[in-house]
């Protein structure tokens, strides 16, 4: 019995942690009102697979806003031009080393 428990413990300790990627933080934070941001930064809990991760920005009418974007090791950064006052939605998707796609969105409001 001791040998079986030891084997199980050894496998459990040596197995990699395959957690799904989740959004850990963002700037701006969801639901905030801010002046037009020069950067929108999403920080994730796990390393991203850049080829399969990204984000888009849209206005209250659902129109996609053109932005420059960069996917880093654990971040997605959007660089919009000056945003007019209104509500905006960032829709993101990420794939981590576990190969599971996770997605979500966050909204913020630009004020004059």
Tell what function each PLM region has.
Residues 40-65:
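Short, surface-exposed alpha-helix to beta-strand junction/turn motifs within ectodomains of secreted
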Residues 19-35:
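N-terminal edge beta-strand
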Residues 35, 39-46, 99-112:
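Extended, polar beta-sheet/loop recognition surfaces of beta-rich domains
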Residues 67-72:
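Short beta-strand segments within Ig-like beta-sandwich modules, predominantly Fibronectin type-III
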Residues 84-93:
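A glycine-anchored, Pro-Gly-centered beta-turn/N-cap motif
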Residues 6-7, 17:
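Cleavable N-terminal signal peptides
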Residues 74-78:
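Short strand-edge motifs at loop-to-beta-strand transitions and within beta-strands
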């Amino acid at each position: 019995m001791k040998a079986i428990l030891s084997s199980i413990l050894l496998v459990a300790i040596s197995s990699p942690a395959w957690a799904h990627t989740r959004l850990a933080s963002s700037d701006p934070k969801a639901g905030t009102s801010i002046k037009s941001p020069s950067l929108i930064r999403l920080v994730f809990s796990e390393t991203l697979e850049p080829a399969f991760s990204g984000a888009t920005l849209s206005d209250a009418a659902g129109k996609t806003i053109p932005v420059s974007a960069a996917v880093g090791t654990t971040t997605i950064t959007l660089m919009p031009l000056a945003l007019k006052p209104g509500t905006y939605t960032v829709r993101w998707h990420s794939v981590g080393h576990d190969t599971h796609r996770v997605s979500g969105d966050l909204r913020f409001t630009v004020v004059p």
